[in-house]
Amino acid sequence: SDVAGYDLLEPLADLDYVKSQGINGPIFALIALDSHDYEIPKAVAGKTQTTREALIDAILAAQLSDGGWNVNGNGADADMTAMAIQALAPYYSSNAKVKSAVDDALKRLSKMQEVNGGYTSWGTANAESVAQVIVALTSLGIDPASDGRFIKNGYSTLDALATFYNDKGGFKHSQSDTTSSNGLATEQAYYALASWYRLKAGKTSLYDMSDVTTMSKIIEKTVVNGGDSAKDPKKDTLASGSSLAASGTTRSITKKATIKLGKMTEAAKAALD
């Protein structure tokens, strides 16, 4: 709510403004608000108040008869269908309408999956579409490496994503991409891998930041050690797997987590390293 003095939540209070861009608006507004259970600010006079219910209703209303979503409303698109699932995932277990919509969307994504485990959007098989599906599945607790609905001819979405990886540490947009790495593809591929890692490590989903310790809480828990830290170390536990080590004004936060990787291509493993 305070980024260089700017309240990022304030524009999201105006429902009409949020919806003006299209279905992307309600989807990512809901994701943003739910990322840390933010309270929606009061809309200014004359504006339509945003509520979580209104955002959910807008997303559900845009679902197509084939079970998916698309920006232009003409047939399910893998990216938009996956993004809609990501936004609705927190309500899957508590809202019957959401559950029904998401179940239909999962069926559509399963049918849309290519024989190599990948996805095509706007006529092109690409890394970003695969990445969005991975994030959608993990947001529901579905392991894309093992769920049979999303494995075609032995290939999972993770296998498909790995085919876009290059030896420079990045990802290309499509197989015909002549650039060494594509910025958007690399960004989305890595946060998709992060979402899978978080699932395997038993952590919250990618956009669920309820496990984040805010700086104010860290400061409140800080233990200032005025003695010899080598002889008299002090630690203040912040959360499971995290510790705040204090020695005078030097402090560090360390987090460690390990997962056992399932069967996947070497390229996908390398991308996680």
Regions found by a protein language model. Give the residues of each.
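An alpha-helical repeat/solenoid feature that recognizes helix-turn-helix modules
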Residues: 1-3, 17-48, 52, 57, ...
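Acidic helix/loop microenvironments that form the catalytic cleft of cell-wall polysaccharide enzymes
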Residues: 159-166
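Solvent-exposed, low-complexity, repeat-rich "mucin-like" stalks and linkers
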Residues: 223-272
